[in-house]
A protein has these predicted regions:
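Conserved cytochrome P450 K-helix E-x-x-R motif and the immediately C-terminal K′/meander segment
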Residues: 44-67, 254, 258-262, 324-360, ...
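N-terminal membrane-proximal hinge/A-helix region immediately C-terminal to the signal-anchor transmembrane segment
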Residues: 2-115, 130-131, 154-159, 410
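Conserved cytochrome P450 K-helix/beta-meander segment immediately N-terminal to the heme-binding cysteine loop
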Residues: 370-401
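C-terminal helix/juxtamembrane-tail motif
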Residues: 61, 444, 458-475
Length: 475
């Protein structure tokens, strides 16, 4: 345990723009605070070799030790961590303000500052963010969005499944499922962008797409390697860890722009690109939003899909449940997988004004970290929290009555409030369709399941490639 706590100390470092002081006005106690290591000690620990891959475990142990709200200092930055379900809900519903601020990784901010690369919604703040987010809300989150999104998703996944069928007539082992699902997620987003027309075809386009998805994967991996290191120093001395990160971002943006140019050559499209044009969004802003939209899609949806197949392989009775109950059961499977393995194990906000969090007064500008991984596995909120039990989400399932605790908003994989995930309907449609088509068409199992553990690499991902044995059913 001490080793994990030491490791976590190296993992988090936040940009100076988020630095603040936190004061409390509680009559009896102050906010529990983790003991700070001397600055030199932190850097020595960092050099010894922690890359933040067990950050979710470190913070979970902190909560076990200090409670559901505690403060920790990383460098010169005070951060407030919360795992109380009601406090998390209040943060998103009542405290985040009209223009919610959130924490971005230091390397991403430095890259944008150094190279002047204006980015999409994730990087926007204030009125600029709100104006563009309102447009995206209208197009992607209204009730009628499900229809046109579902058509694009189903078309793409059907093609993907046919490819797997062709490969696995006599059984195969897919050694790197993550890369295939990354590629699929990117294709889904592109189909959503163009609508009812076909995407570009040919070897050149396929190679471009593969290179792009691989470069995006590398962004997240190289970002994690920069955790806890003074990024300005890495840049100033041109250290390899910075070079690797910069090369990945350079390549991803270059290839993303090339992909966008290929997509824009398509005539008579009916998808998101046309809809954004109909909203009079200017071309530069549209390009920024679309490229970041494509980049974000791969990591989040791909790894959620991967965790679902892993969990189904380890709980084969749930495959039978899906085949029996079909589409009605799949949303419960998705919710339960995201409770156990939220792709974003931490959600962040910057307080826009002095606020009361729990019983404590917290100053404007304070970074607050919602520990979603911890809240989702808390027995106070979910009975048998370590077990994969999709039926816990089904109000009509008699087995649910045996589970005493069930607080749905303790698991918020898409967050809440104004800055919640704008692509959640696309993600849910993709996950539901992919699960159904895979379960319906294949017998599958994860052949290295017992050795799989979650690690933090920006997202919560498996610690090694998941190897999936796949065979067409009744073949």
């Amino acid at each position: 345990m001490n080793q994990i706590l030491k490791l976590g100390k190296k993992c988090l470092r936040f940009p100076k723009k988020y630095e603040t002081n936190i004061t409390t006005k509680k009559k009896t106690n102050t906010i529990p605070r983790a003991k700070s290591l001397p600055l030199i000690g932190t850097k020595i620990d960092l050099i010894k070799g922690g890359l933040g891959t067990r950050l979710h475990e470190f913070i979970d142990l902190r909560h076990q030790d200090l409670g559901n709200i505690f403060m920790e200092n990383f460098g010169t930055t005070d951060l407030l961590f919360i795992s109380d379900a009601e406090l998390i809900r209040k943060l998103f519903i009542n405290l985040e303000g009209k223009y919610p601020g959130h924490i971005l990784p230091d390397p991403w901010l430095l890259y944008e500052k150094l190279y002047g690369q204006k980015r999409g919604l994730l990087f926007m703040d204030g009125e600029e963010w709100w104006q563009n987010r309102r447009i995206m809300n209208k197009l992607l989150l209204k009730d009628n969005a499900n229809c046109w999104i579902k058509d694009s998703v189903t078309k793409t996944i059907t093609i993907f499944i046919e490819h797997w069928k062709e490969q696995s007539k006599h059984g195969i082992v897919i050694n790197d499922v993550a890369s295939e699902l990354y590629n699929l997620s990117t294709k889904v987003i592109i189909q959503v962008l163009i609508g009812n027309t076909d995407p570009p075809q040919g070897k050149h386009y396929d190679e471009l797409l593969n290179m792009f998805t691989e470069s995006v994967k590398q962004i997240f991996e190289t970002t994690t390697k920069l955790y806890g290191i003074p990024v300005n120093w890495c840049h100033r001395f041109n250290l390899k860890v910075w070079q690797d990160f910069k090369e990945c971002v350079d390549l991803s943006l270059l290839l993303g722009n090339k992909l966008l140019k290929e997509i824009l050559t398509i005539k008579n499209s009916s998808g998101l690109i046309k809809k954004l044009g109909d909203e009079k969004m200017d071309e530069i802003t549209m390009s920024r939003i679309i490229i970041d939209f494509i980049i974000a899609a791969g990591d989040t949806t791909a790894y959620t899909s991967l965790w679902i197949f892993y969990l189904l392989s380890q709980n084969r009775n749930e495959i039978t449940e899906i085949r029996s109950k079909q589409h009605t059961y799949i949303p419960f499977v998705i919710k339960e997988a995201m409770r156990l393995y939220p792709v974003a194990p931490f959600l962040t906000r910057i307080l826009p004004q002095d606020s009361v969090v729990g019983e404590y007064s917290v100053k404007k500008g304070t970074p607050i970290i919602a520990s979603i991984y911890t809240s989702g596995r808390n027995e106070q909120y979910f009975s048998k929290p370590e077990e994969f039990l999709p039926y816990r989400w089904d109000r009509l399932d008699e087995r649910k009555g045996k589970l005493k605790n069930h607080i749905p908003f303790a698991s918020l994989p898409f967050a809440l409030g104004a800055r919640s995930c704008v692509g959640r309907k696309i993600a849910m449609a993709q996950l539901a369709e992919l699960i159904w088509q895979v379960v319906e068409n294949f017998d599958f199992r994860c052949i290295n399941g017992p050795s799989i553990k979650p690690i933090t690499s920006q997202a919560l991902i498996p610690n090694k490639n998941i190897e999936l044995s796949l065979k067409v059913r009744n073949a």
